[in-house]
Amino acid sequence: MLDHAGKVRKLDGSEGDAAKIEAWRAGVTQLAKLPHVHIKLSMLGFLVPGWTDDAAKEAIVIGLVKELLELFGPSRCMFASNWHGSGASSNADYCDECQPTMTELYEKFQAWCDGPLGLDAEAQALVFAGTAEAFYRI
């Protein structure tokens, strides 16, 4: 299980992001070729601190999540909050303010699924529960 969306770190929309994203993309592309590798779509603030307060940063997160869904497919991606390890936050990497709440995160991710991620009901069922149920055998 690959956590935190593959751990590309502290993107902010600057020129330096391109090299980080290319290195991340090369790694996750290779990992996605391995059928037993799954990925958690978690700790989004670890990737892009402040994404909840900045539309441009949120767009970066959406793009990364969309790319992971395309690489791994919904059956190997799972929504995760990193609760309780990071408290009630997904934007905390111990450098940021702890937000959003779990409810806000879920609502935001759901809106992405219905909107820019374009996931149908079957794909959403996998990302929000089915993938975890299968992976963890619950």
Place the predicted regions along the sequence by residue:
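H/E-rich (His + Asp/Glu) clusters that bind or coordinate divalent metals
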Residues: 9-138
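Histidine-centered active-site/metal-ligand motif
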Residues: 4
